Amino acid sequence: MITYVFPGQGSQKQGMGSGLFDEFKELTDQADEILGYSIKRLCLENPYSNLNKTQFTQPALYVVNALSYLKKIRDEEVKPDFVAGHSLGEYNALFAAEAFDFETGLQLVRKRGELMSLISNGGMAAVMGLNEEQVAKALKEYHLHDVDIANVNAPYQIVISGKKDEIEKAASLFETMTEVTMVLPLNVSGAFHSRYMNKAKEEFEEFLHAFYFSPPSIPVISNVYAKPYTYEFMKQTLADQINHSVKWTDSISYLMKKGHMEFEEVGPGNVLTGLIHRIKKDAEAMPR
């Protein structure tokens, strides 16, 4: 069996999608019309460093991931058994599963990026060396009640999210702990996947009402629940994803339990491939 995984914010880089925009000219033109700017220019030239601004990053990654998927399907003629995406990448997983078309996905992602970018003064940091339980315990012990766990990317790679000053305080604390191998502040201006996104979630929920989704043709693993989407709760799950943590480790573990599973990353970079390698390695080291 094979699962295609789609990356999210953090995987963007100047030059991504090179060749794809001309190959899929009709969809590229459609994207330009929806966004009101040239997606090709944004990705290849990165004017004003816009590629690292949430409201631009999310549509750019969605388009590049989607075109990468369409090229892969056309060239290899192999459809995956499962799909999953990290945060923003989940929209590409739903697109691949035909839950909505390219245009609908881009409209959703554009709105999501806009709403998330409006909530500033937030920060995020990756803590390496501790598991989710240890991070939660440390936050509680040191009274860092305003910091949330945003992503469980791998068993010992946990991302925290909160107000900028609280994240700086938490990062300083984790750096003093002997078990921690690294604390890496993320280049974001918002406290994504945390309680600070509640307002964005509420507004996005309203926005979703106008759209129609189809039942997924391939199981799509949800970031929020680490199990396949159910059709009745698709919109609710997508809205919840904004202010809930990304259960990436649990999602991959769920897929690994299905039997022999291969994973292929579709889109720019290999961030998810590295995380999956760590999750597999940790699972192999666990006593049976």
From Swiss-Prot:
It catalyses: holo-[ACP] + malonyl-CoA = malonyl-[ACP] + CoA. It comes from the Bacteria. SUPFAM superfamilies: FabD/lysophospholipase-like, Probable ACP-binding domain of malonyl-CoA ACP transacylase. Keywords: Acyltransferase, Antibiotic biosynthesis, Cytoplasm, Transferase. GO terms for cellular component: cytosol. It is an enzyme of class 2 (transferase). Involved in some intermediate steps for the synthesis of the antibiotic polyketide bacillaene which is involved in secondary metabolism. It catalyzes the transfer of the malonyl-CoA group to the acyl-carrier-protein AcpK (Mal-AcpK). This is Polyketide biosynthesis malonyl CoA-acyl carrier protein transacylase PksC. It comes from Bacillus subtilis (strain 168).
